[in-house]
Amino acid sequence: MKAIVFAYHDIGCAGLKALTDAGYDIQAVFTHTDDPGENNFFSSVARVGAELELPVYAPEDVNHPLWIERIREMQPDIIFSFYYRNMLSEELLSLAPKGGFNLHGSLLPHYRGRAPVNWALVNGETETGATLHKMVKRPDAGDIVGQHKVAIAANDTALTLHKKVLEAAQALLKEQLPKLKNGTASFTRQNEAEASYFGRRTAADGEILWHKSAQEINNLVRAVTEPYPGAFSYLGQRKLIVWRARVLDTRHDKQPGTVLSTSPLIIACGEGALEIVAGQNDVGLYVQGSRLAQEMGIVTDVRLAAKPNAVMKRRTRVLILGVNGFIGNHLTERLLRDDRYDIYGLDIGSDAISRFLGNPRFHFVEGDISIHSEWIEYHIKKCDVILPLVAIATPIEYTRNPLRVFELDFEENLKIVRDCVKYNKRIIFPSTSEVYGMCDDKEFDEDHSRLIVGPINKQRWIYSVSKQLLDRVIWAYGAKEGLKFTLFRPFNWMGPRLDNLDAARIGSSRAITQLILNLVEGSPIKLMDGGAQKRCFTDINDGIEALFRIIENRDGLCDGQIVNIGNPTNEASIRELAEMLLESFNNHPLRDRFPPFAGFKDVESSSYYGKGYQDVEHRTPSIKNARRLLDWQPTIAMQQTVADTLDYFLRTTVQEGDGA
């Protein structure tokens, strides 16, 4: 059986040898050139390939059409990936009739993604292993061929655990490769409910947070000790690296990071204490903890902590256009909870942000983006991060006022994009789940899903294509002129202050606000085409936390990226949303202040939205980018979001009525 192999690291070497032993005909080996900035403690795939007299390549992009064509000419039957660091495209995988198979260093579906051995130690796991699975579009998500478990000992480090996983991988391959070859392998689908995903780790992730427990800190030390860069902290401006540590059940009343003893060197933690058994300063030698204390002049009661800034860092200035809107006012609230940000905002109203007007870090001007262009350009020049949140985003307006949608959503926002290019400012642009249109993928993927819209006479798509065109323009400015950007795509965010009931009265609101208006006024709940359309509803607090992390942009991971922000587990039809809302309404303490429920009424969408409307049956996001780039996962159940949103509107309605 002819095989193409993508491999790196010790496990890549083990994979090559196992395939050779199993009688596979290896046509070519693809690997990576070694990074001179990395401690290459592992064996060389290139060297093993040469010893086996195999052709070895190390292209920068194996998914490039030229390489795909070369691999096609090799006519592989099967493809293997053993710790190869890049994703293989669907087109490449399709070249092998038997498919592609990857060896992963965890017990999938747990610890998908990068550095699974290190992450397992960081999180204090007691078991991991090796998994051989089929490769699919989503990383580490294909059917499992086989697994071998490995026990994690209390004294295991990343290196010792890696060696255990390597032995498990060798045994697993010896067991399963013959079965794949003769067609007797069995496959088990992964349980998505148990899946977890972890992103890449960098040296900066080794910083010790002393408010954590001694056990958690020791787990970090074990995960990043030699041959990795090590866990570290600071004594003033001087860096201290911890190579080995011991957890102590010591009670104390000191602040975390305080030195309790210098011989042995013991540090107070949020819970318990940590003895530094061995370490070094950043220009010294590997020494015992007590010797390290002597070398660095560490004395009892001093505190280890993060490296202090030499000068006070200026707050990041964030410009929010459309600050009074649903996303804008919730984002302002989140930013003001963090002292690192000053917010500058513009909008045509201030009812939703009135609670912030007395805050010295919030600067607001009432105005229209189509008129106040000079003010906007000045503040783009002045600020660091720009969020143009002004848009018409209610479905009925797409058919009722298509030209106004285009003028505001595209033309006015294009001016802002160009000012960001002009002044070299970072823009975080609100794309939309609408850009996916009638995409037929099960999950909408930022990097691979097709963007499919309807015919020209269906004017509802003018919003989608206006946003999509801006996405493409921003992407092009990034590629050609260095614009720093992130595109985020909200999937049906809900919560308090979403639209208002006056907007719902003229049909210019999102679904849940329209449904709440029906309940408040005692009118029938209108379900367009029976309400069978499914959406994934996302709590505003979950969404804003993801957006906040995009603004933070740790290690620049979000630069040039597109990020879906949605909750795939909160999928429901509009009818199910209405039924959930009705149940919450009937159980609300203010229920008796409102009319009786008038029932459900099925309505044709064309009669409500107009002839140019066209709906979509489902819209489910892939959130792999959000998990990978933001370390973000939605947590709030839809029932809670519905209850919170309803409560806000009911209490607001009663207060306004009592005030009148």
From Swiss-Prot:
List of residues binding NAD(+): D347, D368, I369
GO MF term (any one): carboxy-lyase activity
Site (Transition state stabilizer): N102
Family matches, as Pfam families: Epimerase, Formyl_trans_C, Formyl_trans_N
Cross-referenced PANTHER family: BIFUNCTIONAL POLYMYXIN RESISTANCE PROTEIN ARNA (PTHR43245), UDP-D-APIOSE_UDP-D-XYLOSE SYNTHASE 2 (PTHR43245:SF13)
Recorded family membership: In the N-terminal section; belongs to the Fmt family. UDP-L-Ara4N formyltransferase subfamily.
Pathway assigned to this chain's UniProt record: Nucleotide-sugar biosynthesis; UDP-4-deoxy-4-formamido-beta-L-arabinose biosynthesis; UDP-4-deoxy-4-formamido-beta-L-arabinose from UDP-alpha-D-glucuronate: step 1/3; Nucleotide-sugar biosynthesis; UDP-4-deoxy-4-formamido-beta-L-arabinose biosynthesis; UDP-4-deoxy-4-formamido-beta-L-arabinose from UDP-alpha-D-glucuronate: step 3/3; Bacterial outer membrane biogenesis; lipopolysaccharide biosynthesis
A single Gene Ontology CC term: membrane
Cross-referenced InterPro entries: Arna-like_SDR_e, Bifun_polymyxin_resist_ArnA, Epimerase_deHydtase, Formyl_trans_C, Formyl_transf_N, Formyl_transf_N_sf, Formyl_transferase-like_C_sf, Lipid_A_modif_metabolic_enz
Catalytic activity as recorded in UniProt: UDP-alpha-D-glucuronate + NAD(+) = UDP-beta-L-threo-pentopyranos-4-ulose + CO2 + NADH; UDP-4-amino-4-deoxy-beta-L-arabinose + (6R)-10-formyltetrahydrofolate = UDP-4-deoxy-4-formamido-beta-L-arabinose + (6S)-5,6,7,8-tetrahydrofolate + H(+)
Quaternary structure note: Homohexamer, formed by a dimer of trimers.
Organism (species): Serratia proteamaculans (strain 568)
Protein's gene: arnA
Function (record text): Bifunctional enzyme that catalyzes the oxidative decarboxylation of UDP-glucuronic acid (UDP-GlcUA) to UDP-4-keto-arabinose (UDP-Ara4O) and the addition of a formyl group to UDP-4-amino-4-deoxy-L-arabinose (UDP-L-Ara4N) to form UDP-L-4-formamido-arabinose (UDP-L-Ara4FN). The modified arabinose is attached to lipid A and is required for resistance to polymyxin and cationic antimicrobial peptides.
Annotated region described as Dehydrogenase ArnADH, given as residue ranges: 314-660
The enzyme's E.C. designation: 2.1.2.13, 1.1.1.305
CDD domains documented for this protein: Arna_FMT_C, Arna_like_SDR_e
Binding site for (6R)-10-formyltetrahydrofolate: R114, V136, K137, R138, P139, D140
Keywords tagged on the record: Antibiotic resistance, Lipid A biosynthesis, Lipid biosynthesis, Lipid metabolism, Lipopolysaccharide biosynthesis, Multifunctional enzyme, NAD, Oxidoreductase, Transferase
GO terms, biological process: lipid A biosynthetic process; lipopolysaccharide biosynthetic process; response to antibiotic
Catalytic residue positions: H104 (proton donor), E434 (proton acceptor), R619 (proton donor)
Organism placement in taxonomy: Bacteria, Pseudomonadati, Pseudomonadota, Gammaproteobacteria, Enterobacterales
Annotated positions for site Raises pKa of active site His: D140
Gene3D superfamilies xref list: 3.40.50.12230, NAD(P)-binding Rossmann-like Domain
Protein's name in the database: Bifunctional polymyxin resistance protein ArnA
Residues noted as binding UDP-alpha-D-glucuronate in the record, renumbered to the chain: 393, 398, 432-433, 460, 492, 526-535, 613
Region (Formyltransferase ArnAFT): 1-304
Transmembrane feature ranges: none
